[in-house]
Amino acid sequence: VLLLDTTNLSAAAFAATAVAALGALAFRRAAGLSAGLAVPFTLVLALVAMGVNVRGEAVRVMYPKNRLAWNKPVLRSLWNSHAHILAFLPEVGPAFYWGGGDGAAQFTNTQAFVVVDGEAGTPMTEWDGNAASLDWVSYDVTTLPYHLRKGGRVGIVGVGGGRDILAAIWSGSPAITAVEIN
């Protein structure tokens, strides 16, 4: 975790490779065997790759969990004790609907996507602070509870990029309690 706090996954992987190469070299020497060129070559290659990658993402994790992560420009790449979080650069485009339906009105907004471990993606939508500018959320299936009961108190588990908070604000909820675990 210390390496992930100070570098990125690729640099940490290269560092682990370098440590493994040193360990292999030590075991070979302890057994009285020649190290040959393979271990020093691996060590040098890992250290060079780590040095190139330590502050940027020259070598980026593109396939976490054996699937292509979004190949877009990254604003931030962060780690915590159990997840890799990518925040992509904001883009202007069609409003994001989890389920807008065929008759959903088309709105445009600025949004950035956040992806956790290459799996769980969520939009972060730019908002001007005016509840009237949130009408676009009313066309999403996730706002069905608010159509049935506007103005109720709201509890949200898994805030993500805040999309559910925007829906609660749109509905006029007087109190919103939100919890994010990751």
Regions found by a protein language model. Name each.
Residues V1-N182:
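Alpha-helical transmembrane segments of multi-pass membrane proteins
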